[in-house]
């Protein structure tokens, strides 16, 4: 149910954010805007592949003897691979499972736990987004004591050209205590009474994040493009089945372009191996 709601949010965002003036993208959006949102959401959900890490992270957190755990689940709706994950736990907590690359149209998770004693677990995790040379960054804080502290979440991106994380707690300190700067832009939310999602957006990408307000914390983040043509290929394929003639043609052209690009990449890699 929650994932259906999320898909509806994504569909509405794509339709509202894309400009009709865009030739190919505008043609697709004009077609999709006439289709019931529930139909679009169902199609988009079937395009997502759930990685094995989702079940293993949930199981690890559930079976853990530690009173504070945190599972972070990431959905990648873009055409880019989310790669080179870096988890930086800013206190003495530890990993229960490891963060993985997230393929286009894929869901992956990992889990963490608190250290011994009256401690929670907090830090950042980030991935390089394809060839954009920048990182998607998530900050979380799952405290031990709810009398004085709350769960907190921030989502954002590093600037283009900044693809290497700072030291262990630098990004956490900025995203928990501070504000966006020249290196990282983000939004932050407190999860004590409210569990409403937060939204980060720039000219190319949007990240939606949400967190619960219990000690078995769970973070969900969805990375999605502003432009329809930056959606993952499997999502575009699902949309192709729903689009009108002009929309189908635009999607088919984009998918063909990507297929040719991938063929050229493989050919180049083979040539390099044979040298």
Curated annotation (Swiss-Prot):
InterPro entries: Actinoporin_PFT, Cytolysin/lectin
Keywords, sorted A to Z: Cytolysis, Ion transport, Membrane, Nematocyst, Secreted, Signal, Target cell membrane, Target membrane, Toxin, Transmembrane, Transport
GO molecular function terms noted in the UniProt entry: toxin activity
Site features described as Important in the initial contact with the lipid membrane, chain residue numbers: 149
Residue numbers spanned by region Plays an important role in the hemolytic activity: 23-32
Region entry Trp-rich region, which is important for the binding to lipid membrane, spans: 141-156
Binding site for phosphocholine: 123, 141, 143, 176-177
Function as written in the Swiss-Prot or TrEMBL entry: Pore-forming protein that forms cations-selective hydrophilic pores of around 1 nm and causes cardiac stimulation and cytolysis. Pore formation is a multi-step process that involves specific recognition of membrane sphingomyelin (but neither cholesterol nor phosphatidylcholine) using aromatic rich region and adjacent phosphocholine (POC) binding site, firm binding to the membrane (mainly driven by hydrophobic interactions) accompanied by the transfer of the N-terminal region to the lipid-water interface and finally pore formation after oligomerization of monomers.
Written domain comment of the UniProt record: Composed of a long N-terminal alpha-helix and a core region rich in beta-sheet structures. Before the pore formation, the alpha-helix binds the lipid membrane, partitions into the lipid-water interface and stabilizes the monomeric molecule on the membrane. Finally, it traverses the bilayer, thus forming the transmembrane pore.
Extra information: Is devoid of the RGD motif, but contains two Cys residues.
Description of how the protein assembles with itself and partners: Octamer or nonamer in membranes. Monomer in the soluble state.
Protein name (record): Echotoxin-2
Organism expressing this protein natively: Monoplex parthenopeus (Giant triton)
């Amino acid at each position: 149910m929650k994932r259906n709601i999320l898909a509806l949010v994504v569909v509405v965002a794509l339709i509202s954010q894309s400009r009709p003036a865009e030739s190919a993208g505008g043609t697709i959006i004009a077609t999709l805007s006439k289709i019931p949102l529930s139909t679009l959401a169902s199609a988009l959900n079937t395009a997502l592949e759930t990685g094995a890490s989702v079940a293993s992270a949930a199981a690890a957190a559930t079976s853990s003897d530690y009173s504070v755990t945190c599972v972070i689940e990431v959905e990648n709706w873009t055409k880019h691979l989310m790669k080179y994950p870096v988890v930086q736990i800013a206190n003495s907590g530890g990993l229960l499972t490891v963060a993985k690359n997230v393929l286009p149209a894929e869901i992956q998770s990992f889990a963490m736990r608190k250290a011994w004693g009256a401690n929670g677990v907090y830090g950042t995790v980030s991935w390089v987004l394809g060839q954009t040379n920048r990182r998607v960054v998530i900050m979380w804080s799952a405290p031990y004591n709810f009398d004085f502290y709350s769960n907190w979440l921030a989502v954002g991106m590093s600037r283009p050209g900044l693809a290497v994380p700072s030291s262990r707690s630098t990004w956490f300190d900025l995203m928990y205590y501070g504000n966006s700067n020249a290196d990282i832009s983000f939004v932050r939310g407190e999860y004590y009474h409210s569990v409403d999602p937060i939204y980060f957006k720039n000219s190319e990408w949007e990240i939606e994040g949400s967190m619960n307000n219990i000690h078995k914390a769970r973070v969900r983040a969805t990375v999605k493009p502003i432009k329809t043509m930056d959606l993952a290929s499997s999502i575009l394929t699902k949309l192709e089945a729903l689009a009108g003639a002009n929309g189908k043609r635009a999607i088919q052209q984009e998918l063909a372009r990507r297929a040719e690009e991938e063929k050229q990449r493989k050919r180049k890699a083979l040539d390099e191996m044979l040298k």
